């Protein structure tokens, strides 16, 4: 089960690994008061997953960042569809974006592949289940999207 505690722990670890001193390039080149509005846009068709983790990546980086989800967890989306809108201090948005994208891409990919398997066994007695064979430290988020 993906709890808020699990999400916070995973996101904080990812931020500490990716940007332990902040995002130095942004801090050196972007004014502190600059704001940014951007969107998480799908490159291909899929199933949305990881919205809570995306939100946490931005909000834990800077509480002034707002994330508006445009796709609900577990819903199908099409290429080019906006899945979320992110707005806030540019430095914070840019610091968190790689972490948020990494989680979103991986979680959406797992949810999309799982949906394909579920569709493939529809009408049979087969069931699709998850496994414990996952990425160390990221088991909960990987299993939550199956």
Could you describe each region identified by the protein language model?
Residues 2-146:
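Acidic/glycine-rich phosphate/pyrophosphate-binding loops and surrounding catalytic core
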């Amino acid at each position: 089960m993906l709890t808020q505690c699990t999400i916070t722990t995973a996101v904080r670890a990812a931020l500490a690994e990716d940007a332990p001193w902040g995002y130095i390039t942004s801090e050196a080149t972007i004014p502190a008061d600059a704001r940014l509005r951007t969107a998480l846009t799908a490159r291909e068709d899929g199933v949305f997953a990881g919205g809570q983790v995306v939100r946490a990546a931005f909000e834990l980086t800077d509480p002034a960042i707002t994330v508006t989800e445009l796709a609900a967890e577990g819903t199908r989306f099409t290429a080019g569809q906006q899945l979320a809108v992110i707005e806030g201090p540019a430095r914070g948005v840019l610091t968190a974006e790689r972490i948020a994208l990494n989680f979103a891409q991986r979680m959406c990919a797992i949810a999309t592949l799982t949906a394909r398997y579920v569709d493939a066994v529809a009408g049979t007695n087969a069931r699709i289940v998850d496994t414990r064979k996952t990425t160390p430290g990221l088991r909960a988020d990987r299993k939550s999207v199956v």
